[in-house]
C-alpha cells in the first residue's frame, strides 16, 4: 500500500514510517502539517493516509479537518486518524462520510504494534476501526438525542462489542458474521448516530 504519514512529532513520525515500511508498505511522503499532507496526497496519490488530529500551526484540529477534506476530495483514500483526544464533532463527521476505509485511534491506547498494523491493514482494505473511547464518546453524545432507539438489534450487538474494544474480526467471530457484515453494521450505526 502507498502511504502518506502526517505527524508533527518527529520521533513518532519516524517510528510510524519505519513500522509501515517494515510491514511492506511504501511510505511515499511523511509530513508535519495539514497543508503539506494535502499537497503530498495530490502529488503522490497514495492509497492510505495516516493523520495526527492536531497539527501545526495551532495544534487544534488541522489534521482532522484535513482528513475530512481528504475523504471528500479523494474518496478512494483510506484514512486512519491518530489522536490524544476524541474530537467528537469531527469524528462524527468523518464517520458519517459513509465511505469505506476509515479508522480513528487514540495514541495512548495503541500499545501493541501488531494490533496497530492489523488496524492499518483493516482500514487499508476498506474496513472500519474505531477506538473504544471514540465509540463511548459518540454514544454519550447520542444518548442525549435518543438516537440509540434507531439502531436494529444487530447494530446494538455490534456497538456493544465495539465499546468493549473488540476488533472487527473478533466481533465477526462472536456474532457468527463475516467481517464485511460487521463493517456494514458499523457504518450503519454511525450514520444513524451521526
State each model region's role:
Residues 7:
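Conserved acidic carboxylate
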Residues 10-29:
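Two-component/phosphorelay signaling modules centered on CheY-like receiver
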Residues 30-48, 58:
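Acidic, metal-coordinating helix/loop segments flanking the phosphotransfer/catalytic sites
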Residues 52, 83:
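Active-site residues of response regulator receiver
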Residues 60-76, 88, 92-97:
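Short amphipathic alpha-helix used as the core "switch/output" element in two-component signaling
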Residues 92-149:
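Short, flexible helix-to-coil linker/hinge segments that flank and couple to helix-turn-helix
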Residues 154-155:
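The N-cap/first-turn positions of alpha helices
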Residues 165-194:
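Recognition helix of helix-turn-helix DNA-binding domains
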Amino acid at each position: 500500500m502507498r502511504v502518506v504519514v502526517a505527524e508533527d512529532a518527529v520521533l513518532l513520525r519516524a517510528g510510524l514510517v519505519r513500522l509501515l515500511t517494515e510491514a511492506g508498505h511504501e511510505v511515499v511522503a511523511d509530513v508535519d502539517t495539514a497543508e503539506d499532507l494535502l499537497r503530498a496526497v495530490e502529488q503522490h496519490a497514495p492509497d492510505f493516509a495516516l493523520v495526527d488530529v492536531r497539527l501545526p500551526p495551532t495544534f487544534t484540529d488541522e489534521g482532522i479537518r484535513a482528513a475530512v477534506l481528504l475523504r471528500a476530495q479523494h474518496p478512494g483514500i483510506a484514512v486512519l486518524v491518530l489522536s490524544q483526544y476524541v474530537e467528537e464533532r469531527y469524528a462524527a463527521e468523518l464517520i458519517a462520510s459513509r465511505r469505506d476505509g476509515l479508522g480513528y485511534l487514540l495514541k495512548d491506547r495503541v500499545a501493541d504494534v501488531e494490533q496497530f498494523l492489523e488496524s492499518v491493514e483493516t482500514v487499508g482494505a476498506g474496513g472500519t476501526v474505531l477506538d473504544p473511547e471514540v465509540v463511548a464518546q459518540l454514544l454519550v453524545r447520542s444518548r442525549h438525542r435518543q438516537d440509540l432507539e434507531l439502531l436494529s438489534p444487530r447494530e446494538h450487538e455490534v456497538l456493544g462489542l465495539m465499546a468493549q474494544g473488540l476488533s472487527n474480526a473478533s466481533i465477526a467471530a462472536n456474532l457468527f458474521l463475516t467481517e464485511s457484515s460487521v463493517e456494514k453494521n458499523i457504518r450503519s450505526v454511525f450514520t444513524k448516530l451521526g
